[in-house]
Design a protein with these regions (language model features):
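Amphipathic alpha-helical coiled-coil segments
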Residues: 38-55, 142, 146-165, 176, ...
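A glycine-/polar-enriched beta->alpha junction
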Residues: 29-39, 46-61, 97-105, 109-127, ...
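Acidic, low-complexity, intrinsically disordered peripheral segments
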Residues: 71-73, 231, 428-473
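Gram-negative bacterial Sec-dependent N-terminal signal peptides
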Residues: 1-20
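Membrane-embedded beta-strand positions of outer-membrane beta-barrel proteins
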Residues: 41, 63-67, 276, 298-302
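Small/polar, glycine/serine/threonine/aspartate-rich low-complexity segments that form flexible
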Residues: 66-110, 241-254, 288, 301-340, ...
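Short, charged, amphipathic alpha-helical segments
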Residues: 129, 192-201, 346, 412-420
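Periplasmic alpha-helical coiled-coil/stalk elements that build and connect Gram-negative outer-membrane
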Residues: 2-3, 22, 143-265, 373-376, ...
Length: 473
């Protein structure tokens, strides 16, 4: 007993026990940590946060400054001027001229501006907030796509493992049948044609096993690219869940529930539809930015500036200096844009119509996908029951054939056929469970309900399935 416990502990320490087998949720958690798709989703969310911050600050005041220096020249002339001196009468018809041919000059200015009213800016604010929400939806869509891709590659690896193991065992069985045929031919019990048929079957099975080995390597590498697992040390994967787990997976007491509930859920929660609806809202705000009167602006403005120029002019040394400031309200109303603004507004309205048409088309497509997937799952339940019954019948036939082989009523070839039939039935059931699991996840994704709990429920919590052959007698 002590030796048995030590062996069991050693197996568990090496990760061989069934408790160490990875399920679909484990694969997703690994993919979430390292797949570039999640980095893209995180970047999309960060971009959305930046757009939301832009919307919050779009009405904040702005301050701009400018300065310049260089060689400058200036000439001013005034005619018909008048001036007066203290204690003397005004003198009219006077002319003044100043000039600086070339000299050092400086100029600076500063302006502070705060928008008070702008339909275009208001539409831009709403558009930025909608774009921020759109980024969140797009990031969620990227995450959901990675979930479905992980599930697809996970189940592909499970089926490749199953098919490869099946063909390896079939190859072992055909090798035994070939050896038996050769022995019986040597003893004179069978003709040479039986040996040739056994050789042909052995070669065909070996070729199929080699092809299955290649498919298995491809499936493992594809899963490794998604999860970051080492393809040279593949994980033990849990098989897809049985059909009996359907009700728990779907969160309904009566299996799938009516298709109308899934259609309603998809109409409100489907990420593709929500994203497309958000694009329609963004297009509407883009059109509002170009609407008539949207370019009218009212700003609170404060300005200050100065200019200085010195040098020699026509009448000797000279210098000019000027300072100005202004605080007030500035109103800008476009009166005529040459028709370009109207054409731009028409273009954006048509683009809004296009976005709405794309949304209507997406609704039809999603509804069709929901209906088709729901029907597939409905039919799949009966198909699963039939395959389970076929597996039980094949196992019973295998047991009977094995017993008959022991008492001499059945031949080795009959035992091999019964064994292959049982393994094929097991493989078909596992493949159907994988298709059903993927269809369930797809339906949940269409309804916007795909999450980690659904991924975990998609795989069997029991011991990983491994096809096996009875010992040769």
């Amino acid at each position: 007993m002590r030796k048995l416990l030590l062996c069991a502990a050693a197996l568990l320490a090496c990760g061989v026990g069934p408790a160490q087998a990875a399920d679909l949720r484990d694969a997703w958690l690994a993919a979430r940590q390292q797949h570039p798709g999640m980095a893209a989703a995180a970047a999309e969310r960060a971009a959305g946060d930046a757009r939301r911050l832009q919307a919050e600050r779009i009405w904040n005041p702005t301050v701009a400054a400018q300065a310049s220096a260089g060689a400058m020249g200036s000439r001013t002339s005034a005619q018909g001027a008048a001036f007066s001196l203290p204690g003397s009468a005004p003198v009219a018809g006077v002319g003044f001229e100043t000039s600086v041919h070339s000299g050092p000059g400086t100029r600076w200015g500063i302006e502070a501006r705060m928008p008070l009213y702008s339909p275009e800016r208001s539409a831009q604010e709403r558009q930025l907030r909608l774009s921020a929400d759109l980024s969140e939806l797009q990031a969620a869509s990227l995450q959901q796509q990675l979930m479905l891709q992980t599930a697809e590659r996970y189940f592909a690896a499970v089926l490749a493992e199953q098919q490869h193991a099946l063909l390896v065992r079939q190859q072992q069985a055909t090798d035994r049948a070939l050896q038996e045929a050769r022995d019986r031919f040597t003893a004179g019990d069978t003709p040479i044609t039986d040996v040739r048929e056994a050789e042909a079957q052995a070669l065909a099975t070996a070729a199929q096993a080699e092809a299955a080995s290649v498919d298995l390597q491809i499936a493992r590498r594809a899963l490794a690219q998604t999860t970051g697992w080492d393809p040279a040390a593949p994980q033990t994967l849990r098989p897809p869940a049985a059909v009996s787990a359907l009700a728990e997976t779907m969160g309904a007491a009566s299996a799938l529930g009516p298709v109308t509930s899934w259609l309603d859920g998809a109409a409100h929660e489907n990420l593709q539809l929500r994203t497309q609806a958000q694009l329609v809202a963004v297009a509407a705000q883009e059109a509002a930015k170009a609407a008539q009167g949207a370019s009218t602006k009212v700003d609170l403005v404060g300005q200050a500036g100065a200019e200085h120029l010195s040098g020699s002019g026509r009448w000797g040394s000279a210098s000019n200096a000027a300072r100005q400031f202004m605080v007030g309200v500035q109103i800008q109303v476009p009166l005529y844009t040459g028709g370009q603004q109207d054409a731009r507004a028409q273009e954006l309205l048509r683009l809004q119509d296009k976005a709405q048409a794309n949304l209507d088309s997406a609704r039809l497509e999603v509804a069709q996908q929901v209906h088709a997937t729901w029907l597939q799952l409905q039919a799949g339940v009966a198909r699963a029951h039939a395959l389970e019954a076929a597996l039980k019948a094949a196992q019973a036939r295998l047991d009977a054939t094995q017993l008959g082989r022991q008492v001499g009523d059945r031949t080795t070839l009959e035992l091999l056929r019964a064994t292959n039939d049982a393994l094929q039935a097991e493989s078909q059931l596992l493949a159907h469970r994988a298709r059903m699991a993927q269809a369930r996840l797809q339906l949940l994704a269409l309804a916007g309900r795909l999450d980690e709990s659904a991924l975990q429920a998609a795989t069997d919590a029991g011991t990983p399935v491994s096809p096996s052959l009875p010992p040769s007698s």
